[in-house]
């Protein structure tokens, strides 16, 4: 079973002054108005994964540099970004956590980030630090080395998989040159990449080594698109492969670009959520894009399957039909309060009387949950 992410703390990042979010359910569904900060919570988790593999400078550069993503309100701009991740509590009611603080590199390029501090800490009644790293010119991440050190190793057995397995997936690009439509190396098959660029290679390995998972993926795609027969996964002579598929009743083979946008996105989602090599924490921003209501129902079921198998699934969505497939306990409402992102969970005791007549999504649509546009808040 994968190590589970239990808590996320974000401070000074985009629209987030400070947010503390406990992830108490297998699936967490973030809902809120446009500009409330759902995608910023997703981006904070993506930044952590980039710090883990030391690609965060490029990640920040492509977003305009760290100075462009610091929280700002009428009182000024934040001087740092802090992110903390904690897994669930162990049997001793304790857990090890990881925290990182980023600041602009005022000694060099102010758009470049400097790691002011990385730390491992044991969370419990005293929240005592296990290991602390302070850098004078910390332009690179050493979190892997910290986690592997002799001093910290015995504390972080549950933490390292959380950091390694925190993955944000983006399947929204279905343009003509979308990654999922292109060629990839047949050997690039250990796990599905975040943009599905190696989906054909990955599906080939799943078919050869994990036939039950492969059949579940095929069955899910057939349920969403009944005309679908199977994938055609055959590497070329130079060990390159691309996604192809067959339609029932026809002899010809179709390319990925001949699938509808919704069908291609659903193939990527099914491959991720039903595959054998799911990361510990799966994060998806607006996964419902382009999906038929029947496919949205299947998406919810696949997310639950991943959650039941020891993975955390975090969905940020605008979809009332998708929200309707989840319980109030799985919902987190994201609002803008006093110019900053704030999160809370619905009051189940207050709302349970309505659930006999209304779905969770309908309650959201009727503004019983919050997470709707507020005219008292300025737009982004």
Predicted regions span which residues?
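Phosphate-binding glycine-rich loops of NTP-binding sites
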Residues: 25-63, 195, 266-272, 319
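N-terminal pre-Walker A segment at the start of P-loop NTPase domains
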Residues: 1-17
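Electropositive, glycine-dotted interaction segments
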Residues: 90-224, 229-232
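Phosphate-binding P-loop
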Residues: 2, 19-25, 274-277
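Conserved P-loop NTP-binding catalytic core
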Residues: 42-107
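Conserved catalytic network of the ASCE P-loop NTPase/AAA+ motor domain
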Residues: 75-76, 91, 274-277, 305-309, ...
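C-terminal lobe/lid and adjacent interdomain/linker elements of RecA-like ASCE P-loop ATPase modules
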Residues: 1-2, 300-380
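Conserved ABC ATPase signature
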Residues: 215, 219-274, 281-297
